[in-house]
Amino acid sequence: MTEWYVDRFVPADSIQQKCFYIEEREQKMKKWIMGSLAILLGVMSISIPFAGIHTAEAKTTEETDKKLNIVTTIFPEYDWTRVILGDRADDVNLTMLLDNGTDLHSFQPAVKDIMKVSSCDLLIYVGGESDQWIEDALESAQNKDMKTINLMEVLGDSIKEEETVEGMQESDHDHDHDHEDEEEKEYDEHVWTSMRNAEVICDAIAETLEEMDPENKEIYQSNAETYKEKLSVLDEEYQETVDSAKQKTLIFADRFPFRYLVDDYGMEYYAAFSGCSAESEASFKTVTFLAGKVDELGVKSVLTMEKSDDRIAQTVIENTKAKDQKILQLNSMQSITSEEIADGATYLSVMEDNLGILKKALN
């Protein structure tokens, strides 16, 4: 990765050229993965008994057959499903694929991941461009009775096209798509950052569980309704916070995966990159634009994503007049680990923490 020095800017042309080579390499890797899926699944069907590949842990065939195998790709799906299952969670093998801190956009499936997807009883996934490998794996799935929940399909017309706001740095990837297919639309995958979307998705999860396990239908319905009430209460707190805020604009010196969140509450934002961008270096133009917006709006903080390098935010601040803004982090839940879950992280707890950050950022 190119180093960023705060005492000078990296020329935009140089950054774009480097990003082009990075994206070209990533595209070749993705093609290799896609080409390997068919061969891999074919080998699996011959060499691995169906009953033994439901989970990564060593379980007897009898134990595995007694339990539903549910695979989720990311943390929000996992946590919603866990809550709706309630006491029934002990009778289900619930797996989260992205549990080691890798985010949705950079995840590359291993053999064990494809095995889990191929043989599970229920698969819950986002369904955006980053999940293309799942669509390919499903075509050769071993369990032909598998049920799936595609979040973007569940939300239908509620999903949003990716947007480039004023001052946002476009990547070579964006330009390539413009030239390849003028009619092709790209949609923002980060649907889980909206608690209103979460309520709709929880209904879909509960309904699917009811179909698969009708004897416990009332449990799933009750758990989903109780959880949705908690989501609704927190949603109202967010709205009240924004309505009473001194200003309603966020300055994001990073990728911006919070489009659904800000749209829910009527906030505005300026960001260095879109939520799905592969960029990691901001151009002189991008940095100076964001610094100018900080000065113009008089905001006291610059935001980044969780586990993000703060170099761009630091450089933006150093180019403002006051040079004393704080750096705050919003958690998009793209890289929650199994260790964090063991320590008590939940979708609601993360969104509550994000509300606290927003209160500081908007006031």
Predicted features and spans:
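Extracytoplasmic metal-acquisition and chelation regions
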Residues: F20-I22, K30, M34-G35, G42-N363
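Short helix-onset patch at the extreme N-terminus, typifying the N->h transition
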Residues: D7, M34-L37
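Short, Lys/Arg-enriched N-terminal segments with co-localized hydrophobic residues
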Residues: E3-K28
